[in-house]
Amino acid sequence: MSLILVATESTVLAIDPRDGTVAGHDLPDRPTCLAADPFVDGRAWCGTRRGGVFRSDDAGASWQAVGLAGRDITSITASPAQRDLIWVGTEPSEVWMSENAGDDWRQTARLETLPSSPEWSFPPKPDTHHVRWIACHPSDAQQLWIAIEAGALVSTRDGGRIWRDRVDGGPWDTHELAIHTNAPASLRVAAGDGYFESDDSGATWRSPEDGLDVGYLRSVAIDPGRPDVVIVSASTGPRSAYVAGVSDGRVYRREGTGRWERARDGWPDPPRTIAPLLSAGRVAGELWAADERGLHRSDDGGRSWREIARYTKTPNHLRGLSVLR
């Protein structure tokens, strides 16, 4: 079974789900984001506050700097459609790419040329904004979606040469965007302004929220075996979504066009936990959740959960969750 990596504000934890073993591995700078490599066993990518991008080839045990030092890295992903293609987002909002596993980097077309850019602003730091999330098309390496926090979800069909601005009715404050391999035109979004979904690659959007009793969504994942099963984490607002001790996070599950149902089997009622980070696993029904208590697993598409590992100390903030190949 694959190792699971959890990035906190100070370290990257490597968790063995077979026995719950947790090993912490420090980087030269504070982690900000995390991604597993879909092609190379044991390879992971981590962005940091000012130290740039780091790569691990031994399941998080050691990390090597691979570029973009001095930039504030806020998001990172490895393309599932092209080996060694890595996408990175920064604050202020820029997108960088490497086609050789971090040996060389180049910036895509500048995002601030988009008409909506004067309206972009991150509320805690209103004079700036950043790339919160990068989502790649499962089979088209040139197509991806970029979440600007806050103000826009933009896209490209040509690898960032031309960016397409946000569309009416779409999410404003996207935190995460999930795509299933078998439904590449279906986008599922967890946003600060609610839940959004599109079945035409983001041209049009809808917001089915029947059953959601809170409106601030942090994370989203799709059952690997069923593209119609979506889970999200949510809370009443940003502080209670992220900060242990004042948290009221919860997890919801939805099948097809049905209503949202809150996960209760193995998941505590609020106010017991932050809104967890979520990730799809490697087999049908397998989903993962990380909160301030530890790592949790579902084998039935999010209906029930069980704790796999508990951290040795409570982290203040979680920065990333990745299931290694």
Describe the function of each predicted region.
Residues 1-325:
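Extracellular glycan-interacting surfaces
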